[in-house]
Amino acid sequence: MAAALRFDNIGKVFPGVRALDGISFDVQAGQVHGLMGENGAGKSTLLKILGGEYQPDSGSVLVDGRAMRFPSAAASIAAGVAVIHQELQYVPDLTVAENLLLGRLPSALGWVRKRDAQRFVRERLAAMGVDLDAQAKLRRLSIAQRQMVEICKALLRNARVIALDEPTSSLSHRETEVLFKLVDDLRRDGRALIYISHRMDEIYRLCDACTIFRDGRQVASHASLANVPRETLVRQMVGREISDIYHYAPRALGDVRLSARALEGDALRAGASFDVRAGEIVGFFGLVGAGRSELMRVIYGAQRRTGGALTLDGEPLDIRSTRDAIRRGIVLCPEDRKEEGIVAHASVAENINISCRRHGLRAGLFLDRKREAETADRFIKLLKIKTPNRRQKIRFLSGGNQQKAILARWLAEPDLKVVILDEPTRGIDVGAKHEIYGVIYELAKRGCAIVMVSSELPEVLGVSDRIVVMSEGRIAGELARGEANEEAVLNLALPQGATAHAA
């Protein structure tokens, strides 16, 4: 019997880059096939070929033994293929029900029957075990909830081949377990699934087989992961040994740089109080909905502050906008880097130099293009940003390389005092994480106060000097590095009702 999906010698070339070179592997019906590799290795490019966004320059895609060409996303969908990318595709001002049934809403005489649509979607969501309000607009949902809408959309299409690109990157533990159950159900139902993830636990938990990409090539394939050590997968992914991904080293800390007292905002239930010293890395952990990102956006001036006080180096700090924050040396690398972190239509060099244009990189009234080019080239080399050249549009880079460019922007900033990192390694491979941690330590050595929000508990424990735990919109506790472990952090992160019930 023919494989449900086969890639046969797939090749793809972009200007100056061979993105894919001779990719060949099968995915059987009733199988979950993992794809692993560093950012920029070619995994997402392959899925874009499968989804009809790109056309291969060589090779072919076979579905149930038949060679297929997908000139558009619609052609891919019509062939029974669903691809869920990291960059979510939705209409923000439509409801959950309308997004899920987009293009096939039930109608009568040209009028959409919204009541029927909402009832149908509620029934399907309940059957999947997904807790979403069918009438809620996508704009009002969290990133995690929007991710679940995308996954549900593929399931409602009854696709035979489903590809998931980092599907749990924004999901809570409970939502991740719901997804895992859905994947297990789909496998039992005979669907063929491709699963891209940088999280080893997920690959070993879900995948029957695994293929490793590096620099656009297929470097290894494993028909089973039962006897494959994790160290082998890491070595195959990055081409080198990484003994300690965090490479933490203590630093000399300065005086208190940023201080928050009884800070309140629309999504913060109780006043938040904490300090961060110069050169210190303070990790913020909490479950989805704990209020971490909201607190950071209040500090940065992106959300309204309703109470409390901030000081910077002992002086009162009145921030009314993000521009105020940047002027005072406070910057934020946002969770949603594609929407809020990068200027997608601009080049890598322009994205790196955005902050520097306020000072230094001018020759009279004109931008000093030569110095901008030198600055961009220096950080591209320093941070190992994978790009054909500085003029490449940043939207064509992988997520990890986009994140490095955002960090380069602030490394180039001479007056930096506080760096807020919201999920800095979300959707990024182990090799790129290793390099980004190095950038974070470098900023701390410069005397910056670092605030790092992360949903990855090993990352928080591995990188932070101190850990602040949030739960239900308030700070639930604080742990020094020496006393922090997974159990202690999770006990603080669980809602009080859940903790009491467990007891």
From Swiss-Prot:
ATP binds at residues 37-44. CDD domains: ABC_Carb_Monos_I (cd03216), ABC_Carb_Monos_II (cd03215). Keywords: ATP-binding, Cell inner membrane, Cell membrane, Membrane, Nucleotide-binding, Repeat, Sugar transport, Translocase, Transport. It comes from the Bacteria. GO terms for molecular function: ABC-type L-arabinose transporter activity; ATP binding; ATP hydrolysis activity. The keyword Cell membrane applies. Pfam families: ABC_tran. Belongs to the ABC transporter superfamily. Arabinose importer (TC 3.A.1.2.2) family. This is Arabinose import ATP-binding protein AraG. It comes from Burkholderia pseudomallei (strain K96243).
